[in-house]
């Protein structure tokens, strides 16, 4: 998945398979292997993607929450306020709690539930965690185009919109709007892993 080549013109590089490495820079392997020291660096586009509707109107996804709220406001002022409130309520939680949990041994369900039940926000998260992405979006937003826009990102990643237990995932994808792209092409990730291994005495044969 980390293959880069000049598929059309010399010097114009194409990522043949993977382009966006959503979880690589946030994961522990990137830090523990110090991949940045081995040439693996990520660029963060301010505009991630867009959804184009049959009437040629569109919604563009921005990395900055303020710009994303302004984009949503073109369709629904209420939905823009909801989005802004979600960022205020859960943005920090995602960074300080949810992301570390993704890369840690799972807690016992009873322990996780007891921790979340201690706050109103946590109890709401438990409810959303059990729901489907469609149910969550229907609860939060009024504008169908806004719902479709956020749902499209989930389906592209391979998550079913009507699958129970993935409502929290929808919230994560709404609030964690990033699309890190490997500088110099996705193959730099493979090359960086090779260099990291060689720095510890390994011999890589291809």
Where are these predicted regions, by residue range?
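Active-site phosphate/pyrophosphate- and oxyanion-stabilizing loops and adjacent acidic/basic residues
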Residues: 27, 135, 191
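Rossmann-like flavin
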Residues: 54-164
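A short glycine/serine-rich beta->alpha loop
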Residues: 8-13, 157-158, 177-180
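N-terminal glycine-rich phosphate/pyrophosphate-binding loop and immediately adjacent elements
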Residues: 1-98
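Short, conserved clusters of charged catalytic residues that mark active-site
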Residues: 24, 132, 188
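Helical element adjacent to the flavin cofactor pocket in flavoenzyme catalytic cores
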Residues: 128, 169-206
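General beta-strand structural signal in soluble alpha/beta enzymes
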Residues: 42-44, 148-150, 206
